[in-house]
Structures are given as structure tokens and as C-alpha cells.
Regions:
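Non-catalytic N-terminal targeting/anchoring module and adjacent flexible stem/linker
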Residues: 1, 52, 248-249, 253-466
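Short, well-formed alpha-helical segments that are part of the catalytic scaffolds
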Residues: 11-25
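Glycine-rich, basic loop-to-helix element that forms the pyrophosphate-binding segment
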Residues: 66-86
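Short beta-strand-to-loop acidic/aromatic patch adjacent to the donor-nucleotide binding site
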Residues: 87-99
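Conserved nucleotide-sugar donor-binding catalytic segment
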Residues: 147-237, 241-252, 258-261, 265-266
């Protein structure tokens, strides 16, 4: 029997659609599914919605009601403590505003039949509502069906929504009720460490709602000061401690998972928020605690994280307590950025952008304005951008630029030499940009002038958080 656990708090606008996606499962709701619905002290009509389904399906619906809000962890623990007593129970966690594809549970049943030794398995996640598309970790589902965390240490699992647990994993799962974010990642990864593996249900889909008002727990968590204080101990370091108890060390899977998630703190959008939330002293303490978290994570693991060069440099700088920069290797016509033997980026793949004509800057009126402000590179005063068209080279004028890049309040890039202005020759409807640096010329992207605007070609910034 599949038990679908849905904690709900003030989600009357979504909960019916969520429950209906379970009732409509092709495997057969009344024959194979039990709904465990928890109203966590809602102040809207959520509890009344749950009672409607209990009245309609009395043999397939269990409801619990808390007078006061206890938090999602307490709600899940309440359900688990009862369900784990049931024979042959398999639990699926579903958030009260998310949905299941109609064959999701059937796909899970097929998976467990083929993989009888696996006790944890996850559905693929697709976003819907305010944002559509695939979760950035969905690539895992195309690579393998069962993740052995010793071999596939770079296959992290963070979310609990869409995850099935049974047998020993169901007995082991427990959520830290002191936490109101990342409690799911901590709980599921303790189980994964215990099992040593987890499954990927390639054709099963979990629809994750991104609300237009960003009111979900995940969205709100970044504005909670606790995320930058106690969370580092209760989340990251707690998982590391569990790894030490289980394996006598922080295994590569945990190292990669923590470093992969920690990089989010260093993204531009998060950095600006952190700077507003934390005082100067709190920021210093936060960085000090980040260093403690990073201590057991090997540089090789960090170098494998899919992130931008400045984020990786900042992670290593915090870890080592000194400024660390990616290695630059110059060839005849390129510059390769790498760290610990892992190639991160190539200069030739970066883009120069043209933003339009200038109207207010004296001496530059009517000229086109461009900038080469890639996160991987900061131009020096001796560097310059050039343009080439059918063997003719033109060097544009340098234009004042105040753009800078900050991470956790620290300036990591200064683009004062990155901007330029130029007049477009009448017969230059297309040309290629290049940069002269370190005594060599590196060709960059090709641009085309069409219908009064510029279109540029070239690779998008990989893992660009800026």
C-alpha cells in the first residue's frame, strides 16, 4: 500500500488540486493508495477541505488536526510514527501545493518491482505555475537508475517531495523539528547514508509549484536570519557528523552535497539579501562558520561543483583563509581557467555585449556602448577589446565603467577597464570581437547588426549566478 503524506498549512487555494492529483492516479486510488492529511493549525479553510475528502473516501483518508502550528517537520513525524507500524507500507511525501503526474505512483511500483533491494526512490521534478522547466538536477535521471553514493558521489539529493521510502528507510526517517528549512535534505540524506544508495524513477513526474508571490517555505527561508546562524550547525555539520558516525569520515557524497548547496549563499541575489540581513559582526561570524563547514571538504570535490569561477574562488578563499584564484593557462590563442586540474572556463567562450547608443555622456554621444564584464575575468589597464571585419581591425575607445562584482560584501571583480564605445562603420554589419591580454589575441563572439539592433553569438555563461 502506498501512503501519501501531505502536511498542509493555509493552502486552501491549492490543496484540492493536490489531493485530486493523488485520487486520479492510474494505479487505482481506492485499491492501492492511502492519504494521510495533516492540518498544521491552519487559519483558513484548509481543514474543512481535508474533512470533505475524509467524508468522501472514509476508507482511504486519514486526517490529523493540530490546533496550533507545529511546523512541517512535526506534521511529517506524526504521520511517519503511525504509518511505519503498517505492514508493507511505502510512503510518498507530497507538499500541499504540488502535484503528481497521473502515473507517478504506478511508475514507482514498477521501479520497486525491478529493484527489490532499493528502499528509497525519487521522482523527477518539473516546475509549474510562476516558473516552468526542469529542476537543475534532473540530469541524474538520464545517467542511471540506482545511485551508489560511493561511486556516484556527485549525485546529490536535496528534496523530500516526490520521494518514496519503504522498509528500513521508512523506519529510519525523522525530521528535525527545530528546523523550518533544509530539514528535508537532512532527513532524506541520513536515510541515504544508511542505505548507501537511492533510486531514480526516470518516467515518474512530481510537479513543484513556484508561487507568483514567492510565499513557499523554500522562498521565505532565505529571508530568515536563522539560515545564516544555527542552520550551518543543525544542517550541514549535523549531516557531516552523521557521516562520521556511519563511515568514520565525511564521505565524498556528503562533501559534494554540502559544497553544492553552500554555493547558493554566494550567488549575487543571495549575497545582496545577506548583506541587508546581517550586521558587519554577524557577517564575520557567518564567514567564520562557513570556514568550519568547509574544513573537511577536499579541494578536489569543490573543484567539481558546477558553479561560476568567482563563486568557486570565494569558497576556496573562505576555506583556506586567504585569497585564492583560479589558475590561468595561456595558449597561443586562448586562456584556460582551471582549478586542481579541472577546467572551469575558456576566455574564447565568453561574450562581449553591446547595450545601445550613448546619449548623455559628453564626448560619446551617438556611439555604441559595449562591455566585457564576464564573471571569470577582470580586465587590466593594459588589456583592450578589439573588433575585426574581413581582416580589418578597429580598437574602440575605452568608456568609464563603475560596475563591480561582490560576494558576501567582498569585491571580487572590478570592471573599470571593461567598457568601451565605438562608431560602427557603415559597411560593418557583422564582425568579431576579440581581447588582447597577456600579449596574445583571443577571439571572442561574433555579432551581427540586423534591423537596427545587435545580435551576438557564442556560448552562454556556464553556471552564471551573476
Amino acid at each position: 500500500m502506498f501512503w501519501v503524506v501531505i502536511p498542509a498549512y493555509n493552502t486552501e487555494d491549492y490543496i484540492r488540486e493536490t489531493i485530486d492529483s493523488v485520487i486520479g492516479q492510474t494505479i487505482g486510488f481506492e485499491e492501492h493508495i492511502m492519504l494521510y492529511l495533516i492540518d498544521d493549525g491552519s487559519t483558513d479553510g484548509t481543514f474543512n477541505c481535508l474533512r470533505e475528502y475524509k467524508n468522501k473516501y472514509p476508507d482511504n483518508v486519514v486526517i490529523k488536526h493540530f490546533e496550533n502550528n507545529h511546523g512541517v517537520s512535526a506534521a511529517r513525524n506524526t504521520a511517519i510514527s503511525e504509518i511505519r507500524q503498517k505492514k508493507d507500507a511505502t510512503v510518498l511525501f507530497l507538499d500541499s501545493d504540488d502535484l503528481l503526474k497521473e502515473d507517478a505512483i504506478w511508475q514507482a511500483a514498477q521501479f520497486f518491482e525491478k529493484e527489490p533491494e532499493v528502499n528509497i526512490a525519487s521522482l523527477k521534478i518539473l516546475y509549474f505555475d510562476a516558473k516552468e522547466g526542469e529542476h537543475r538536477l534532473n540530469w541524474k535521471f538520464e545517467k542511471c537508475q540506482v545511485v551508489d553514493i560511493k561511486e556516484n558521489y556527485n549525485y546529490p539529493q536535496f528534496y523530500i517531495g516526490g520521494v518514496f521510502l519503504r522498509r528500513s528507510a521508512l523506519q529510519a526517517i525523522e525530521f528535525d523539528e527545530r528546523m523550518n528549512f533544509w530539514e528535508d535534505a537532512l532527513a532524506i540524506n541520513r536515510c541515504i547514508l544508511g542505505e548507501g544508495r537511492y533510486g531514480l524513477i526516470r518516467d515518474g513526474i512530481y510537479y513543484y509549484r513556484k508561487r507568483p508571490d514567492e510565499s513557499s517555505l523554500v522562498d521565505r527561508a532565505w529571508t530568515d536570519k536563522e539560515r545564516y546562524t544555527t542552520f550551518l550547525d543543525r544542517g550541514y555539520r549535523a549531516l557531516m557528523s552523521y557521516s562520521r558516525r556511519k563511515y568514520h569520515r565525511v564521505i565524498p557524497y556528503v562533501q559534494f552535497l554540502v559544497a553544492y548547496h553552500l554555493r547558493l549563499f554566494l550567488w549575487k541575489s543571495k549575497g545582496e539579501l545577506i548583506s541587508e540581513l546581517l550586521t558587519e559582526d554577524e557577517m564575520k561570524k557567518f564567514r567564520k562558520n562557513l570556514k568550519k563547514v568547509l574544513r573537511p571538504i577536499k579541494p578536489k570535490i569543490i573543484s567539481e561543483i558546477p558553479t561560476s569561477v568567482p563563486v568557486l574562488e570565494m569558497i576556496m578563499s573562505i576555506k583556506q583563509g586567504k585569497k585564492v584564484r583560479a589558475r590561468r593557462t595561456y595558449t597561443e590563442n586562448d586562456c584556460i581557467f582551471s582549478f586542481r586540474g579541472t577546467e572551469l572556463a575558456r576566455m574564447s567562450e565568453r561574450k562581449v555585449r553591446i547595450y545601445g547608443t550613448l546619449s548623455e555622456r559628453e564626448g560619446f554621444e551617438g556611439m555604441w556602448h559595449g562591455i566585457f564584464a564576464t564573471p571569470v575575468f577582470q580586465m587590466a589597464e593594459a588589456d583592450y577589446i578589439f573588433m575585426e571585419h574581413e581582416g580589418t581591425r578597429m580598437i574602440p575607445e575605452r568608456y568609464p565603467c563603475r560596475r563591480k562584482l561582490y560576494i558576501l560584501g567582498e569585491k571580487v571583480r572590478n570592471y573599470r577597464f571593461a567598457a568601451f564605445a565605438f562608431w560602427k562603420p557603415d559597411d560593418w554589419d557583422e564582425f568579431q570581437f576579440g581581447i588582447h591580454t597577456n600579449g596574445i589575441d583571443i577571439m571572442l563572439n561574433h555579432v551581427v547588426f540586423e534591423d537596427g539592433k545587435w545580435n551576438w553569438e557564442g556560448e552562454k555563461e556556464k553556471n552564471s549566478e551573476f
